[in-house]
Amino acid sequence: MQSITITPDLSSNFKDFVTIDAHTEGEPLRVIISGYPEIKGSTILEKRQYVQQNLDTYRKLLMHEPRGHADMYGALITEAVTEEADFGVLFLHNEGYSSMCGHGILALVKVMCQTDSIDLGLEPRTIKIDSPAGLITAKAYRDSQGKIQASFKNVDSWADALNCSVNVEGFGEVNYDIGFGGAYYAYVDADEHGISCGQDNVAQLIDVGRRIKHAVMASHTLVHPLEEDLSFLYGTIFTSKKVTNPEAHSRHVCIFADGEVDRSPTGTGVSARVALLYAKGEVALNTPIMIESIVDGRMIVSASAESEFHGKQGVIPEVSGRSFITGKHQFFIDPDDVFQNGFMLR
């Protein structure tokens, strides 16, 4: 039988994008390493604004089907914009751009070290990253088996509002707290409201999570103390004491952006959660807790120090989790492709 040879290089005919894909505790991250033009702007927020206004077609191309999916997440590496940083990053998802992403930081550090983009010897290395939420200090190190692990100290995180309630259309009265951990989240006790945080209840979690987000957005004004661009509610996080790992403190299910479900416990989400717990006197400084996810992934988070940020009293969270590279991809834009902007199905 005659064999067929497929020419692998199409880049001379089509515009291409190269990515390295990874996941942290089950949540995907698509690291874009080539294909974008120069990202203009002197600050990371200016760069995000430039991408939003001029290059959003590329986000849709790489996040949406048929190249991505409704729950895809991306990281676009930029040059550093502060003297301390090694590089900058913009985070992408199905709806737009986030201010910070904990699982993304952990996966990005793993990718940068495992591909030797950052040299990691035998000693732990500090890596500083410009994000829209602020400067992130990550640490890469080798464990006792020589495997690369990562953790990061997040931006100032705080309890923004406690013991609030809102009437949610089609569901009823919901009690919630609001915390900031690089993004704002509404936290809802799923057990109190009779909502299962299991994988078999994803449809209800998405539906109610979106309803809660919209209800809170309509009734509660968020004002970030420094950056207006960060003054928005990113998602709803359901918390539950019903865990599968006996060492876990609780379970998180985060519904964010346009109904995305985080497979991980959510790095910024566990950061804001530990700030809420500290504000309520339910956790002490430097006391790590494990939070598990809807797919039984887990992150370890602690309040490493108290902090004060422009009048907001909070903590500096430290977060760790496991990340793994899953593939390297070269995506093309056929100029005749009728779905260059992609699409989303649920």
Curated annotation (Swiss-Prot):
Disulfide bonds: none
Domain of life: Bacteria
UniProt EC number: 4.2.1.77
GO molecular function (one): 4-hydroxyproline epimerase activity
Protein name: Protein Spea_1705
Function statement: In vitro, catalyzes the dehydration of trans-3-hydroxy-L-proline (t3LHyp) to Delta(1)-pyrroline-2-carboxylate (Pyr2C), albeit with very low efficiency. The physiological substrate may be different. Displays neither trans-4-hydroxy-L-proline (t4LHyp) epimerase nor proline racemase activity.
Pfam families membership: Pro_racemase (PF05544)
